[in-house]
């Protein structure tokens, strides 16, 4: 254990997700040895992100103004909404350059064991967005795990009666993966989500 502010820094760094005590200590000592200009730049970035970044009033993605850049873009297809759990999922989908619609970030997934129910997520706001009839398809892109599946099923039941097309991202085998290492659920989904191959 170190003295005073050094230990305080290690403790604060250790509170970050994925940073254990050893990593926190390494980062703290890296910062102590770093150029003061670099440390100030990091401190400024941390302060500014907390002061200036908010959540989009429409989709709950991260934004620096009332609307995120995606919701503010008139070229995006307003008839398609892709529902994701977290803002990082928006970034992952945007990297593919396959989706030209808009998003809705739930802020998590239904997890009764973790104490997260439907009322803890941005589901009411999603239903309100769908009410004007602009959206024709809702793509459920929650994580392919138990919580994501529960959330997708819940949303499909809630939104199905609205007459929208509700789809779920196909899940299956990763590129470069071996069949022998695939679990039964993944392999089963790969068969269910198979598509025609044109010769």
Swiss-Prot record:
The keyword rRNA-binding does not apply. InterPro entries: DNA_Rcmb_RecR (IPR000093), Hlx-hairpin-Hlx_DNA-bd_motif (IPR003583), Rcmb_RecR (IPR023627), Rcmb_RecR_Znf (IPR015967), TOPRIM_dom (IPR006171), TOPRIM_RecR (IPR034137). Coiled coil: none annotated. It comes from the Bacteria. Disulfide bonds: none annotated. It holds the Pfam family RecR_HhH. One of its GO terms (molecular function) is zinc ion binding. A zinc finger (C4-type) spans 56-71. The keyword DNA repair applies. Keywords: DNA damage, DNA recombination, DNA repair, Metal-binding, Zinc, Zinc-finger. Residues 79-174 form the Toprim domain. One of its GO terms (biological process) is DNA repair. May play a role in DNA repair. It seems to be involved in an RecBC-independent recombinational process of DNA repair. It may act with RecF and RecO. Belongs to the RecR family. NCBIfam families: recR. This is Recombination protein RecR. It comes from Frankia alni (strain DSM 45986 / CECT 9034 / ACN14a). The gene is recR.
């Amino acid at each position: 254990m170190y003295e005073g502010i050094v230990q305080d820094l290690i403790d604060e760094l250790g509170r970050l997700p994925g940073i254990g005590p050893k990593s926190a200590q390494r980062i703290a000592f890296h910062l102590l040895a770093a150029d003061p200009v670099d440390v100030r730049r990091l401190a400024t970035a941390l302060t500014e992100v907390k002061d200036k970044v908010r959540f989009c009033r429409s989709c709950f993605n991260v934004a620096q103004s009332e609307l995120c850049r995606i919701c503010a873009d008139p070229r995006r297809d307003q008839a398609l909404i892709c529902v994701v759990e977290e803002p990082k999922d928006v970034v992952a989908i945007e990297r593919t350059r396959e989706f030209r619609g808009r998003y809705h970030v739930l802020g998590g997934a239904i997890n009764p064991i973790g104490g997260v129910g439907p009322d803890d997520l941005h589901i009411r706001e999603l239903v309100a967005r769908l009410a004007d009839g602009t959206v024709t398809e809702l793509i459920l892109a929650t994580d392919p795990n138990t919580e994501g599946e529960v959330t997708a099923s819940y949303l499909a039941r809630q939104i199905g009666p609205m007459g929208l097309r509700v789809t779920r991202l196909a899940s299956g085998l990763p590129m470069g993966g071996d069949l022998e290492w695939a679990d039964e659920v993944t392999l089963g989904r790969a068969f269910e989500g198979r598509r025609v191959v044109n010769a």
